[in-house]
């Protein structure tokens, strides 16, 4: 129990340090050409057990798309979007990941986000989840801004879609 608490505190400290570096623009991006679909498939594989536990399916749409970015940082963005989609998805639903020429999106069927909170979810320490730190989307925002990518979220009829876009 104590080891788990120490691990949680350690993760929180590391996230806060990472966020402060990102906000100060004290991060050098290691930009290289990456295959976004391949990266996405690798990330989805890591979530296989969690997906089975929640009886969720993943559908990846789109072809191989190459972008120039920092692989580690874009991986963090996709992991955050996917973990949030899983956390808030209805059991027995499908999460759709769409990879287009200049857009990546993840949509789930689940609880919508209050329209009044759409802008604030990107700020530090804002979370719907008592277990969450509220740092994930703030880190995502800073990573995407460093990459000069746009990003956003909107409610769907029966869920939520998060996306990011880049210039082609």
Predicted regions mapped to residue ranges:
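A conserved beta-strand-to-alpha-helix junction within the catalytic ATP-binding
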Residues: 30-48
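Glycine-rich ATP-binding loops of the HATPase_c
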Residues: 148-156
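Short conserved segments within the C-terminal catalytic ATPase subdomain
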Residues: 50-59
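Short conserved segment of the HATPase_c
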Residues: 113-125
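Short helix-loop "hinge" at the ATP-lid/N-box region of the Bergerat-fold HATPase_c
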Residues: 85-86
């Amino acid at each position: 129990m104590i080891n788990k608490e120490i691990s949680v505190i350690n993760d929180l400290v590391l996230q806060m340090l990472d966020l402060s570096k990102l906000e100060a623009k004290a991060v050098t991006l290691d930009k290289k050409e990456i295959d976004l679909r391949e990266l996405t498939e690798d990330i989805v594989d890591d979530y296989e057990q969690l997906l089975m536990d929640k009886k969720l399916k993943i559908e990846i749409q789109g072809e191989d798309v190459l972008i120039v970015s920092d692989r580690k940082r874009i991986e963090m963005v996709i992991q955050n979007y996917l973990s949030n989609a899983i956390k808030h998805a209805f059991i027995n639903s499908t999460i759709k990941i769409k990879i287009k020429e200049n857009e990546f999106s993840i949509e789930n069927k689940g609880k919508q986000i209050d329209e009044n909170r759409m802008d604030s979810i990107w700020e530090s320490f804002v979370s719907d989840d008592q277990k969450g730190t509220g740092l994930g989307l703030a880190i995502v925002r800073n990573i995407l801004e460093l990459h000069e990518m746009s990003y956003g979220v909107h409610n769907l009829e029966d869920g939520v879609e998060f996306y990011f876009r880049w210039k082609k």
